[in-house]
Amino acid sequence: MDWLCKLEEDWKDSVFRDAVKDSLDICGAISPNERFTFVETPHHSFLLVTNILPDEHGVIKDKKLTPGDLITPSVTSVPVGNAKDLNHDIYQSSESSNGKTVLQKGCLRPNNSNYLMFNAKHIPEHHTLFTNAYVSYSKEDIQTSLSFNKSAFISKILSRCNVPGILDHNNVIHVDMLLWLLFAGPLSCCSRTHCFGYTRPDIRRPFPVVLPPILYNDSVDIKMFVNMAEIYVYGWYGDDKIKSFETTFFKNEELQAMIGELRAKYVRKSVPLWHVNSRICLFCALYLQNRLCLENLKHDVNKIPLSPIIIQDCVFNDTNISCQPTVAVGHITPGTNVTKLFPVYQLDKLLSYISLQPDGTCVITSP
């Protein structure tokens, strides 16, 4: 779809800029998922050209709630003497309860499909902290996360970003700068003073920051990938404290301009950044997870403020008695009769499985 705006020769440049801005606003409102190319003519007219290729994006259907997702019984009848015996089963159906005294109870019960929605409706208070879902990392995710050289992975992402129609005008223009700041910038490594990377004689520097598994998947929806990368880069560099990035790949002013573009996009939006600003590596995150799980066994804490990290399909999960890197600590999931296992990892054994190659890539090897 082409947009054409013809201006008179004697109009001021400010009017021309306003026309361009208004046209971009109109295009963004009509086609928010399209990326436009600006073409200017010598006679104060311009074109905003969008992708001419057919849109092959699939249509996402709205998810319908099932009876197990949301249970809100308005009235449940129980005998007065048995009021203290109310348990999880009493919320299943009001037909199993008979009595004269009526107790009103409505609940949103967490399950596999609405667990995050359940957590979002509960505010942390003293001794009642919320528990999030598991965060699972595969062997490939961990190798990508701990690699100082992610050029092969970045090349795959950039090749997908170059496909017309993938990104829109709301995304940053220079995706290569965005990925460099995320994976190789001055704030892309662990911020803890005693990072586990210093304990390895062959590394002697902090490990890279551990990111969500979606940012280690080169086949994920590319628009979702770029949007999440923008939030992390904005959270790390948005305060404009770094003046020199000490790189020969990009100019400082170009990187600052890209960060300013992100700041203008997110500064007035309520974007949660508490999880972004942590900037810790996988091993430091596992260390904090170990301490939190073990210390909570000593206290009366019903819920834990943690998304437990689960490491899949690699030697990290070896359960052999002679070399057992993990044990499990159980906690009852709030509002259910389900016990949730929090793995406690033996970090010294995990570190021994990590091998850093001469090119800066990480490989997980068996002991």
UniProtKB/Swiss-Prot annotation:
Organism: Elephantid herpesvirus 1 (isolate Asian elephant/Berlin/Kiba/1998) (EIHV-1)
Domain of life: Viruses
InterPro entries on file: Herpes_UL95
Similarity annotation: Belongs to the herpesviridae UL95 family.
Protein name as catalogued: Protein U67
